[in-house]
Amino acid sequence: MTPFGARLRELRAARGMTLSALAARLAVSPAYLSALEHGKRGTPSRGLVHQVCEAFDLIWDDAEALARLARLSRPRPRLDTAGLSPEQTALANRFADTLPHLPPATVAAIETLIATAHPARPRRRRG
């Protein structure tokens, strides 16, 4: 499951909305929405994320958080190590091999380390 899919499911459950009802409201098939929730589809489009935000009447901060989760929800992320050091390339490969076997506490610790070492920059608003 992707971060976006997990949050989408939480939002839907909190409002007592069925998968079919939300799919109809978003004008997508229930199969597509289920695949999105389970991480079997790619990153949702900005338009779909916007529709979800409207369907759940999310406030600005929650809508931004959902959009951020969508950007972090590529089910098959790729990392091009061309131009990186041998150490960085080795780390990327080792991480790819190890990640599926890491316990949740270790994943959380790595996420904290990355967030501390490279804080996310706020997105600039267009328009």
Where are these regions (language model features)?
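Conserved hydrophobic/aromatic packing and binding residues within compact polymer-binding modules
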Residues: 8, 22-23, 33-36
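Alpha-helical residues within the helix-turn-helix
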Residues: 13, 24, 54
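Interfacial/linker helices and their anchor residues that mediate assembly or domain coupling
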Residues: 71-127
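A short, Lys/Arg-rich alpha-helix, primarily the initiator
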Residues: 1-14, 109
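DNA major-groove recognition helix of helix-turn-helix/homeodomain DNA-binding modules
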Residues: 47-65, 71-72
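Recognition helix of helix-turn-helix/homeodomain-like DNA-binding domains
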Residues: 27-43, 51
